[in-house]
Amino acid sequence: EWKLFRRDFARYYEREVYPATLARTFDPYLARGHLDLPEFGFRVNINLSADIAGIDRPEGSESETDALVAFTRKFSEGATLFHSTREKSLVRQEVAAALKQFNEQFLLPSRSRREALLKQIEEGSQVQEAPRDILTVLLANRADQDLDDDMILREVAFFMQAGSHSSANALTHGFHEIDQWCRRHPEDRSRIMADDHFLQACVHESLRLHPASPVAWRTASEAFLLPDGTSVAEGESVVIDLMSANLEEPLFGSDAEHFNPHRRVADRIPPFGLSFGIGIHT
């Protein structure tokens, strides 16, 4: 899948796919004359995630989005099962049922269309390019990567969950921080509208203050020493305090706890802190 996420891929989605998806999701709210930002954030991100994942929505309807939202929220319960206060066996059953329904309603039709296209391309009878999405990449490489149907289902479903839930929250936090900043600093309002780099700085600053998770849990695959000399045995859990790291005053200044899109940090420090962790995501 990493082959997808290159500059030309991002440019293609930014210019070709996202505008149409945003417009389609916006239309019902424009007709009503109002929107709830968290709800809109979830719905627009679920559609953007579906585009990248390779989930077709032939009707382009609100009911299709409703179904995807319901499935994805249930997948989120499975992804955060460790923290659930509900009976875990019941949550597992519900997630399994949601996966089955998602597979039948969305994945199988999307997969059938892509398999037919890939076959036609292989035979030379199709001039249309294969869709540029995760499902197509998985299907095209399933033999080389030994991917079975269950693995493909889980991979696509997890991407749908990961690509929508935290992004919707980030949109809401970012909008709130920018709105509050402009109330205090009205001179920056026009700059946000005209300067993409400044808008990006606003988003990075909000992500630093509002990581998707305040901590990251890892299990040691072998024994090692932490930089301070603490010994960690194989199999022990290591908790990384992302929130505290993002508020380190030596790195982000004496006002680290506050939103400041004009903040300057050293080149080696990501402006969004450890909100995305460090290293390759697998």
How would you name each of these model-derived features?
Residues 241-267, 276:
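Conserved cytochrome P450 K-helix/beta-meander segment immediately N-terminal to the heme-binding cysteine loop
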Residues 45-49, 53, 171-178, 202-203, ...:
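Buried hydrophobic packing segments
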Residues 216-218, 239-242:
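Short, conserved beta-strand edge motifs with alternating hydrophobic and charged residues
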Residues 270-282:
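Cytochrome P450 heme-iron axial ligand motif
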